[in-house]
Amino acid sequence: MGLLSFRQPSWRISRSQFYPIWALSQLLLNPIAVLAQSAADYYVESLPGAPEGPLLKMHAGHIEVDPEHNGHLFFWHYQNRHIANRQRTIIWLNGGPGCSSMDGALMEIGPYRLKDNETLEYNEGSWDEFANLLFVDQPVGTGFSFANTNSYLHELDEMAAQFITFLEKWFAVFPEYERDDIYIAGESYAGQYIPYIAKAIQDRNKDIHEKQSSSARWNLRGLLIGNGWISPAEQYPAYLSFAYEEGLVEEGSKLGKELETLLSICKSKMETGPKISITDCEAVLNKLLDKTVDSNNQCINMYDIRLRDGSCGTTWPPDLVDVKPYLHTYEVIQALNISPEKESGWDECDGNVGAAFRPQKSEPSVKLLPGLLESGIEILLFSGDKDLICNHVGTEQLISNMKWAGGTGFETSPGVWAPRHDWTFEDEPAGYYQYARNLTYVLLYNASHMAPFDLPRRTRDMVDRFMHVDIASIGGAPADSRIDGEPLPQTSVGGQPNSTVHQEEEQQKIKETEWNAYAKSGEAVLVVVIIGVLVWGFLIWRSRRRHNGYSGIAIKSPSRTSIMGRFHNNHSNGADVEAGDFDEAELDDLHSPGLDRENYAVGEDSDDEAHRQDLPRAQESSSKSENNLVT
């Protein structure tokens, strides 16, 4: 879910009981479980309800970010299924504040969606096709994250600093991803989080450069914000503008006049009080929703105006009915390495976090966008056109008013604006886009507050193009995506796993990689064999000379520490290799194994993942005695 509304019923934010006996036993029997420091400790070996076939490579668990207040952030990471032209990592954050990024993982851009409360199926538009995905529950207290209840965060700079701590520690565990191109994505109130985190990353990189530190600088490439709460000064008035535009309220009507009065109060408060969350401004939305209640006691869904329900959208989307029980399942909790210190069950949105996070000092994140754009960071703002609470009218207005890189809004030159380009996807009107000076805006037709939930394939096509994914060397069935009727460069959406052409090309790619590894190790073996043959030949020659009565210098028996001795000892087990008399199987026993991966995961392993995979077999007897605790 995205932006929280005061209309949310209390049951949505209650904290349910979370297996207290199991939690206590975990702490007593396995006290180091919450202090995991290696990738193996986070490895997800199995996932209940996953589709048949090889499990996608994933890690999950907690990273400590605030030792003083027991603050831990929960993450769920998926390795990309295919590598295109470069390695990328997308960090996904949901909004709220206080709403879990498991929404994004299980209802929007993650590789799985729920068929029911215990069965997963593949998401055809998952963003993990060509990018690693890192979902993080933040700030502390959100979703599976936890902290002492009196230590929830209040300001955006606090949140950003804590997130930098998380990334520092996360990359220490998973260093193979630290050099990736990094994109930060999210929706709704994450429109406040994301620019602040981006600025904090830039400040960190600058500090490393100035101090000539050996720490790696993070390659921040772009930001993606969907239906974002970025500029309250434009978004609050857009409640009424959008309602007029969509025919929800008639201009000049009694209701229209009532809302105009509330809006004028809102604007006066924006000039004097906090700039991000203003109670008097939220009254405009609440009044509008109250007046849409019909005879069936149903009102407009504030996240999708095409729908009506009794809670005005607070129980939407419908997948929530399955997500919550799934994430409360004991086996899922174990599989995701949930710390026993997380004493309450998963809630989509935590009201305590949301109540605490009401910034009084922080400036709205829109203030940071010009500097980020001018520094070379590409930014994509996308909006589903059926969302009310963070509607596209407000987003378009903030773009029109924003000044950066010598222009205002989408100006390409003084008084000339970049044109809007029509976008069609698979023969259907998909929306339009505009671009100027590192900023891209996309309006998605027939999409809600959570556009990837409604349109997974279109949004995947959108994100691939924003990240400049090049699939020329990958293959697969290209998606039919066009701008102003002209086909775009080829990318593939949902065709990769089921594409015969792609599978054949991927298998060939793996074979070539294996052959390269084999050839390198084979060269080393060949050198050893040649040396062995030469020495062996020399010994035979000397033996024959001695046998024929020739005198010479006596050759001592090779010692165990000599090179010849080691070679002899290593091959005294019957696997003798002789020049001109060997087969490839014998060579395979000598060289390091090459790449042996399924075609759904081509990338680097974490250092100790193999150890984790072997651990259950090595410790089978001991694990039974420890009640099969998660390692």
From Swiss-Prot:
One of its GO terms (molecular function) is serine-type carboxypeptidase activity. Residues 542-631 are cytoplasmic. The keyword Repeat does not apply. GO terms for cellular component: membrane; trans-Golgi network. Residues 489-501, 619-631 have a biased composition (Polar residues). It catalyses: Preferential release of a C-terminal arginine or lysine residue. The active site is at residues 188, 387, 449. Residues 477-501, 586-631 are annotated as: Disordered. InterPro entries: AB_hydrolase_fold, Peptidase_S10, Ser_caboxypep_ser_AS. It comes from the Eukaryota. It is found in: Golgi apparatus, trans-Golgi network membrane. The chain crosses the membrane at residues 521-541. Protease with a carboxypeptidase B-like function involved in the C-terminal processing of the lysine and arginine residues from protein precursors. Promotes cell fusion and is involved in the programmed cell death. This is Pheromone-processing carboxypeptidase kex1. The gene is kex1.
